Amino acid sequence: MSFVIAQPEMIAAAAGELASIRSAINAANAAAAAQTTGVMSAAADEVSTAVAALFSSHAQAYQAASAQAAAFHAQVVRTLTVDAGAYASAEAANAGPNMLAAVNAPAQALLGRPLIGNGANGAPGTGQAGGDGGLLFGNGGNGGSGAPGQAGGAGGAAGFFGNGGNGGDGGAGANGGAGGTAGWFFGFGGNGGAGGIGVAGINGGLGGAGGDGGNAGFFGNGGNGGMGGAGAAGVNAVNPGLATPVTPAANGGNGLNLVGVPGTAGGGADGANGSAIGQAGGAGGDGGNASTSGGIGIAQTGGAGGAGGAGGDGAPGGNGGNGGSVEHTGATGSSASGGNGATGGNGGVGAPGGAGGNGGHVSGGSVNTAGAGGKGGNGGTGGAGGPGGHGGSVLSGPVGDSGNGGAGGDGGAGVSATDIAGTGGRGGNGGHGGLWIGNGGDGGAGGVGGVGGAGAAGAIGGHGGDGGSVNTPIGGSEAGDGGKGGLGGDGGGRGIFGQFGAGGAGGAGGVGGAGGAGGTGGGGGNGGAIFNAGTPGAAGTGGDGGVGGTGAAGGKGGAGGSGGVNGATGADGAKGLDGATGGKGNNGNPG
């Protein structure tokens, strides 16, 4: 069996020699062309002219054949040159790994680190640190992400030239890994890993801190600090609540529609008020819609929505009914006015008001006016005001005004109690303006907190026997605070001529849990037994209702990570949302 051996050096030398031969032949052909392709006739007779033309035609044919031969020659030279390069590249690729291993072996054996090459990346979910890059050239490996509760791995460091590896992201509730240091002479520091999100708990789990950015070397920029993890939501407080749900009061009926004739569509009926404890007010009925197809000068108005019913103690008010919409098709000189949304019902003690109804939309009229949103219902004692309704929109037509959003309801005053004054309810949000034109409604004012009540006086016993004792109602438990967002990682230091990395942004605070509400006071105690014909004892005074549980405050946003020495400080995390107001508790035990 024979083997073919290719020597790139010999092939390249042969290609060079062939190129030289081609150049010599081309030069000779060019010199002969001037002498042979245009032979002059020796005399003016026909024979001399024919002989000169014959020699000239032979010379021109030779030049054409020489040009084709030169093109083939050039193709052969190019093929040999390309083949020589391909063989040389293949030999270099085959020799490269062995050569790099031979160069790295002494440094690896002596220092445990190669001279040239990139560090290995940490495996995901292990928190493994990234490997360091080569001492001379190489980037650090990226750190592996952490499992739940496990910090992310640190990024590997570079050597003399190279970039530091990025830190791995922290698992749930754990910190992100730090970015690797850049090359000593030149390179960029690795970015810190992001902190893990908080784990839910009684006080809301803290989000993990973002990893610090890696420092730069002599030239280069430090890495950015990682973003802190978001805190987890706090656990809701225990709320005794009612034993069985109470059916809401009856809703109002919708208004009658108006078709093809001018006028106003029927208005919606008002919702019924809640009468029992915990019974929500009924929603108001929607106003009737109006429409016409064709006609001249027809003016129509949508029906107004019905008002929402007031809620019973501890129950929200009903939502106001929406205003009726008006749609004109093919009408000339018509006027379309949307119905106004109705006011939401007021909330019962400790409950929010109902939302205002939305204004009716209009379309197709020559002049269009959308309906206004209704005002939100006022909150009961300690309850939040209801949001205002959205203003109606003008969907089509040449001229029109969108409706204004309704004002939010006022928050209720705080509950007066023996120990803690109730927190005023939050005013409702104003409704949005119309799609094209219209102003949003103003938000309702927050309710005033109640003044702390004085301690209750002791009950007087009956003449015959002692009066019945008053049981102390149990208030709702306090909700846990939302988790604090994780701190952003510090920005990495810069090189002498580089820039510092910016600190990572703080994580968002967790959402606070909802507070429980206090129970209703117990019934009065029975009079004592009569001894020696004494006067019957008076019934004991019913116990005061328990203080409503305070809604949990939203968790504080995580502080922004510190920047480098001259870097920008990271932005603070967003504050968590306030906890929702607790519902009314169970009745207290009788005295």
From Swiss-Prot:
Q: Which residues form the PE domain?
A: 1-93
Bias (Gly residues): 303-324, 336-363, 371-412, 477-491, 539-567, 579-591
Annotated region described as PGRS, given as residue ranges: 94-591
Going by the UniProt record, its keywords in alphabetical order are: Host endoplasmic reticulum, Virulence
Ranges where the record places region Disordered: 303-412, 468-491, 539-591
Subcellular location(s) of the protein: Host endoplasmic reticulum
Tell me which Pfam families the record gives.
PE, PGRS
Q: Which InterPro entries match?
A: PE-PGRS_N, PGRS_rpt
Q: What is the predominant subcellular site recorded for this chain?
A: host cell
For this record, the Gene Ontology CC terms, alphabetical, are:
host cell endoplasmic reticulum
Report the family membership: Belongs to the mycobacterial PE family. PGRS subfamily.
Q: How does it assemble?
A: Interacts with human TLR4.
Q: What does this protein do?
A: Involved in endoplasmic reticulum (ER) stress-mediated apoptosis through human Toll-like receptor 4 (TLR4) signaling pathway. Localizes to the host ER, leading to ER stress, disruption of intracellular Ca(2+) homeostasis and increase of nitric oxide (NO) and reactive oxygen species (ROS) levels. Stress response results in caspase-8 activation and apoptosis of macrophage cells. Apoptosis may lead to dissemination of the bacteria, thereby spreading the disease.
Its domain description in UniProt is: The PGRS region is important for localization and function.
Protein name (record): PE-PGRS family protein PE_PGRS5
Can you name the source organism? Mycobacterium tuberculosis (strain ATCC 25618 / H37Rv)
Gene (UniProt): PE_PGRS5
